[in-house]
């Protein structure tokens, strides 16, 4: 049973798909590494803030709130206030 060179070579479409898949995986890996670096940088900033006497939990809350839409944030604050009043916390 003889194998020809054409039979051993892969289809060009298969090669293209493999190359494309490899490129996608490598991009994801690079982005994951960048994400890790950025996460480390953010952690360092919070540590610096804590060292300067700031409350990290409050900072995280403010960052999260600033990401929200103003109307969404106002609605959540209203609900929170209503619940706190119902529990006698205000």
From Swiss-Prot:
Segments traversing the membrane: none
Protein family (similarity comment): Belongs to the UPF0335 family.
Q: Which organism is it from?
A: Rhodopseudomonas palustris (strain TIE-1)
Protein's name according to its UniProt entry: UPF0335 protein Rpal_4670
- What molecular function terms (GO) are annotated for this protein? DNA binding
Q: Where is the signal peptide?
A: none
**Which InterPro entries has this protein been placed in?**
GapR-like, GapR-like_DNA-bd
Pfam families from the xrefs?
GapR_DNA-bd
């Amino acid at each position: 049973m003889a194998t020809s060179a054409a039979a051993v070579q892969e289809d060009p479409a298969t090669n293209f798909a493999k190359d494309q898949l490899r490129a996608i995986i490598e991009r994801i890996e690079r982005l994951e590494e960048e994400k890790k670096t950025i996460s480390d940088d953010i952690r360092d900033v919070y540590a610096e803030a804590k060292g300067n006497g700031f409350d990290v939990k409050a900072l995280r809350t403010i960052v999260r709130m600033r990401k929200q839409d103003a109307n969404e944030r106002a609605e959540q604050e209203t609900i929170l206030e209503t619940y706190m009043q119902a529990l006698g916390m205000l």
